[in-house]
Regions:
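Acidic ATP/Mg2+-coordinating residue in the GHKL
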Residues: 52
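Short alpha-helical Gxxx[C/S/T] motif in the catalytic ATP-binding
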Residues: 83, 87
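Conserved micro-motifs of the catalytic ATP-binding
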Residues: 6-9
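Short beta-strand/loop element within the Bergerat-fold HATPase_c
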Residues: 32-44
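Short conserved segment of the HATPase_c
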Residues: 45, 57-70
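Conserved glycine-rich
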Residues: 95-96
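Short helix-loop "hinge" at the ATP-lid/N-box region of the Bergerat-fold HATPase_c
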Residues: 25-26
């Protein structure tokens, strides 16, 4: 974990949101793969970036991965499709945003952003 900057928010709920995203990354990253978590800030916002070198997100799945009960085509069938939707709700409830980007063939990247003065 590489961290810089300060963050103000609900620690428990934010930890839950980040944990759900990391769990999703773990499910789609092969054994021996890498998951990185970075934090940064500037005058406008604090940001948490989570990257993996797993299977990436298919273009068909990308617009839907934060929808409740949505399971991607690469899903192992064990999940309920709730974790990423819950993460988005937690982050939005604190005035933040979360977005996912496909880094295929080298994985996915999730960016959580909290604007200063809103949390």
């Amino acid at each position: 974990i590489h961290a810089a900057g300060a963050f103000r928010g609900d620690f428990s709920w934010t930890s839950e949101a980040i944990g759900n995203i990391v769990k999703n990354c773990m499910e789609h990253t092969p054994e021996g793969g890498r998951i990185e978590i970075d934090a940064a800030e500037n005058a406008l916002f604090s940001e948490i970036i989570i990257k993996d070198n797993g299977t990436g997100i298919s273009p068909e799945d990308l617009p839907h991965i934060f929808e409740r009960f949505y399971k991607g085509k690469d899903s192992d069938g064990k999940s309920f499709g709730i974790g990423l939707a819950l993460s988005r709700m937690i982050i939005a409830g604190q005035g933040g945003t979360v977005k996912a980007e496909n880094r295929k063939p080298v994985g996915a990247m999730f960016t959580i952003r909290f604007y200063k003065g809103t949390v």
